[in-house]
C-alpha cells in the first residue's frame, strides 16, 4: 500500500504532484527505461531518439562507455567490451563455460565472486549491470530536467533464481536506484496488455529475449493478474540462435578456431543476418578477416532448419505450463509475444500453430516489458490506488524441510502465489535435545535424497526437555521478488535462528521439467517409501523410549520379564532394519506395545506411589 505524506497547507508546494517512478527492462541484448505520464506509459529515448540501449559496456583505463558507442568497439576490443552480462548474473565460471562455450573474456575471481579481467580492472557481472542501470537512470533524469527518481520496478526473467534476483538488486543499489520491486518479465507484459487493451481471461505470455526464455499462463480478471503456471529456461535466447548461425558461418568458411576479435565479428554478422531474415528470404553475409574475404549465403529456410530444435524446446515448456495451469490450449484467449527474438517468422508460426491462434503483437515486443514495469512502478509509488492492480506470481517448485528419517515435509507447495508466508510447528526427537538442524529443500519428491538442497542452518539454545515437549515454530517467507527466508523459533524461550536462501546454482527449464516428471512417475513408489520411513522412525522412537525406561526402572521386573522385553526389542530392531512393507513394522510395533504394557503399568503405579508417599488425604 502506498503511504501518503500529510502536511499543513503551505508546507507542500505541490501536494498532488506526480511522483516520478520508472520501469526498467534490464535485457540481455538491449535495455529500456519507461515511465507513465498523463496515464500513458511510454519509453524514454536518448538524444538520437533511440529507446533501446544496447546492454554493452566497454572498459578502458580512462573510462567506461555504455550502449551504442560500446557496441562499435566490440569487434576491435572484444576482451574489454562486455556483452550479454545478464547471462552471467548469479552463475559460476564452470556454469558459464558449460552453457555458452567459447567466449572472448578472461574470467577470474574477485572478492570471492566471478569477475572479468578488463583494462579497468576486475569487473563483476553485477558491476557491469549497474553501469547499464546507471545509464538508464541518467536518461530518465535528463528527460525530466533532473527531477528526482523516487523508485524503479526492474524486470527479471521468471526463472531467475534467488542468486540472480539478488544480483539484480545489488546492481541497482550500486547504480543508486531504489528498487520498488523486481517484476517477472512475462507478468510485466501482461500488465501492459491488461491495462492498455482491457483484456480478461487466460493469456499465454511467450517471452523469447536475447538470453532467456519464459512462458507464463496468466488469468486476467478485473485488474487482477494471477500467474497460473510458469516455465522457461534462463539459458536459452536469441544469443543461442546467433551461435547456430556462427557455427554455420564457420562451417561454410572452413574456419575452426577464431580469435576473440574474429569471434566478435562472426557474432555481430550472425545477429544482423538473423534480424534481416525476419524480413527477407535470403541474406548474403560478408566476412573479412585474416586478409581473406568470404561471402556466405544464408536463406530463411536454412535458418529455420538450424533453429527448429530450439523453438521446439520452447514449445515443450509451453506444453508443460499449460498442463500445470490445469487448462487446455483452447482456453487460451490471447498469446502475447515478448522479446526481439519473437520477430523470427519461424517462432511466430510455431507458437501460433501450438496455441491454434494468431499471436498478439499490437505492442512492440521489445518495449512491452518496460511499459508494463512503468505502469507497475506508477502504482507502487502512489500515483494510483494500489487496488487498481494486483500481481500474483507463483512458485515453480515446492519448498520444504527435512524431518526424521530423511523425509521431506512440504511447507509451501508448488504453484502457490507469492508473496506468501507459511508456518509449521516441529518438535525434538530425543530427550534433552538442545539443538536442531534445519535443512531447507526444493522439489516434489517425498525423500530428501530426491530433492534439491537449498540451505542448512541450526537452532541452538533449546531448553533440555523430554522428547516431543519442545515447540519449534518454523516460518517460510517468500517475498514478491521470489527470495526465500526461513526462520525457526523455540516458543518457550523465544530463541531464534534464520537464514535467507541465495542458492548459487540456478535451475534450467529442463531440470524443473525432469523434477516434475520424476515426481509423477515415482509418485506411488515415493509414497510407499515415505510410509516405510515413517514406520521406521516410529519404531526407533518406541525402541529408544523403552530402552530409556528399562535403564531407569528395570528393578520393577524380574530377570525373566526383563529378558523377555529385551528379546522383543531385539525383534523390533530386526524387523525395522529388514522390513520391506510399512505394515510389517506397524505390526511389530503393536506387538511391542502389548509386550510392554504390563511394564508401563508398573512404572505408572510406581510413579503414583512415589508422589503419594508421605502425603495425607487432605493434601491430596
From Swiss-Prot:
Query: Can the keyword ATP-binding be found in this entry's annotation?
Result: yes
Question: Which PROSITE patterns does this UniProt record tie to the protein?
Answer: HSP70_1, HSP70_2, HSP70_3
- The reply on keyword ATP-binding is yes
Q: Which GO terms describe its biological process?
A: iron-sulfur cluster assembly
Q: Which InterPro entries match?
A: ATPase_NBD, Heat_shock_70_CS, HSP70_C_sf, HSP70_peptide-bd_sf, Hsp_70_fam, ISC_FeS_clus_asmbl_HscA
Task performed by this protein: Chaperone involved in the maturation of iron-sulfur cluster-containing proteins. Has a low intrinsic ATPase activity which is markedly stimulated by HscB.
Q: Which family does it belong to?
A: Belongs to the heat shock protein 70 family.
- Supply the PANTHER family for this chain: HEAT SHOCK PROTEIN 70KDA
Q: What is this protein called?
A: Chaperone protein HscA homolog
Species, as recorded? Pseudoalteromonas translucida (strain TAC 125)
Taxonomic lineage of the native organism = Bacteria, Pseudomonadati, Pseudomonadota, Gammaproteobacteria, Alteromonadales
Gene behind this chain? hscA
Amino acid at each position: 500500500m502506498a503511504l501518503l505524506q500529510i502536511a499543513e497547507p503551505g508546507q507542500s508546494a505541490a501536494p498532488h504532484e506526480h511522483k516520478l517512478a520508472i520501469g526498467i527492462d534490464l535485457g540481455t541484448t538491449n535495455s529500456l527505461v519507461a515511465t507513465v505520464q498523463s496515464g500513458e506509459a511510454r519509453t524514454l529515448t536518448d538524444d538520437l531518439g533511440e529507446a533501446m540501449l544496447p546492454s554493452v559496456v566497454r572498459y578502458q583505463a580512462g573510462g567506461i562507455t555504455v550502449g551504442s558507442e560500446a557496441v562499435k568497439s566490440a569487434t576491435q576490443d572484444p576482451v574489454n567490451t562486455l556483452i550479454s552480462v545478464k547471462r552471467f548474473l548469479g552463475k559460476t565460471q564452470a556454469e558459464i563455460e558449460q552453457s555458452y562455450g567459447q567466449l572472448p573474456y578472461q574470467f577470474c575471481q574477485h572478492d570471492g565472486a566471478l569477475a572479468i579481467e578488463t583494462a579497468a580492472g576486475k569487473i563483476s557481472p553485477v558491476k557491469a549491470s549497474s553501469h547499464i542501470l546507471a545509464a538508464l537512470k541518467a536518461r530518465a533524469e535528463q528527460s525530466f530536467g533532473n527531477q528526482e527518481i523516487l523508485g524503479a520496478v526492474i524486470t527479471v526473467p521468471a526463472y531467475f533464481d534467488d542468486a540472480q534476483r539478488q544480483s539484480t538488486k545489488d546492481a541497482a543499489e550500486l547504480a543508486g536506484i531504489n528498487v520498488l520491486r523486481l517484476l517477472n518479465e512475462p507478468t510485466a507484459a501482461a500488465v501492459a496488455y491488461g491495462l492498455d487493451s482491457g483484456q480478461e481471461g487466460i493469456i499465454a505470455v511467450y517471452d523469447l529475449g536475447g538470453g532467456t526464455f519464459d512462458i507464463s499462463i496468466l488469468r486476467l480478471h478485473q485488474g487482477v493478474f494471477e500467474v497460473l503456471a510458469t516455465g522457461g529456461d534462463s539459458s536459452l535466447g536469441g544469443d543461442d540462435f546467433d551461435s547456430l548461425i556462427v557455427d554455420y558461418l564457420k562451417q561454410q568458411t572452413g574456419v575452426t578456431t577464431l580469435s576473440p576479435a574474429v569471434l566478435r565479428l562472426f557474432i555481430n554478422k550472425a545477429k544482423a543476418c538473423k534480424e534481416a531474415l525476419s524480413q527477407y528470404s535470403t541474406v548474403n553475409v560478408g566476412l573479412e578477416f585474416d586478409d581473406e574475404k568470404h561471402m556466405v549465403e544464408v536463406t530463411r529456410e536454412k535458418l529455420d532448419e538450424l533453429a527448429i530444435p530450439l523453438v521446439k524446446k520452447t514449445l515443450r515448456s509451453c506444453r508443460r505450463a499449460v498442463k500445470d495451469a490445469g487448462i487446455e490450449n483452447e482456453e487460451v484467449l490471447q498469446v502475447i509475444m515478448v522479446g526481439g527474438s519473437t520477430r523470427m517468422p519461424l517462432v511466430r508460426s510455431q507458437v501460433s500453430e501450438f496455441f491454434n491462434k494468431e499471436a498478439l503483437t499490437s505492442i512492440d515486443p521489445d518495449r512491452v516489458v518496460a511499459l508494463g514495469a512503468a505502469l507497475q512502478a506508477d502504482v507502487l509509488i502512489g500515483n494510483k490506488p494500489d487496488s487498481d492492480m494486483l500481481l500474483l506470481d507463483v512458485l515453480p517448485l515446492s519448498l520444504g524441510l527435512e524431518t526424521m528419517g530423511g523425509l521431506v515435509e512440504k511447507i509451501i507447495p508448488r504453484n502457490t502465489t507469492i508473496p506468501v508466508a507459511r508456518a509449521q510447528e516441529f518438535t525434538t526427537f530425543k530427550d534433552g535435545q538442545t539443538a536442531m538442524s534445519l535443512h531447507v529443500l526444493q522439489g516434489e519428491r517425498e525423500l530428501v535424497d530426491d530433492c534439491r538442497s537449498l540451505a542448512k542452518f541450526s537452532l541452538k539454545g533449546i531448553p533440555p526437555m523430554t522428547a516431543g515437549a519442545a515447540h519449534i515454530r518454523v516460518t517460510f517467507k517468500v517475498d514478491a521478488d521470489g527470495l526465500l527466508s526461513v526462520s525457526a523459533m523455540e516458543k518457550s524461550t523465544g530463541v531464534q535462528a534464520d537464514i535467507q536462501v541465495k542458492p548459487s546454482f540456478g535451475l534450467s527449464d529442463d531440470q524443473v521439467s525432469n523434477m516434475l516428471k520424476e515426481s509423477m512417475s515415482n509418485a506411488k513408489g515415493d509414497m510407499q517409501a515415505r510410509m516405510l520411513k515413517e514406520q521406521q522412525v516410529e519404531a526407533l522412537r518406541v525402541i529408544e523410549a523403552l530402552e530409556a525406561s528399562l535403564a531407569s526402572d528395570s528393578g520393577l521386573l524380574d530377570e525373566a520379564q526383563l529378558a523377555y522385553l529385551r528379546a522383543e526389542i531385539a525383534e523390533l530392531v530386526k524387523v525395522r532394519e529388514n522390513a520391506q512393507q510399512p505394515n510389517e513394522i506397524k505390526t511389530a510395533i503393536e506387538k511391542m506395545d502389548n509386550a510392554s504394557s504390563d511394564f508401563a503399568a508398573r512404572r505408572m503405579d510406581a510413579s503414583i506411589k512415589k508422589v503419594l508417599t508421605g502425603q495425607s488425604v487432605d493434601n491430596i
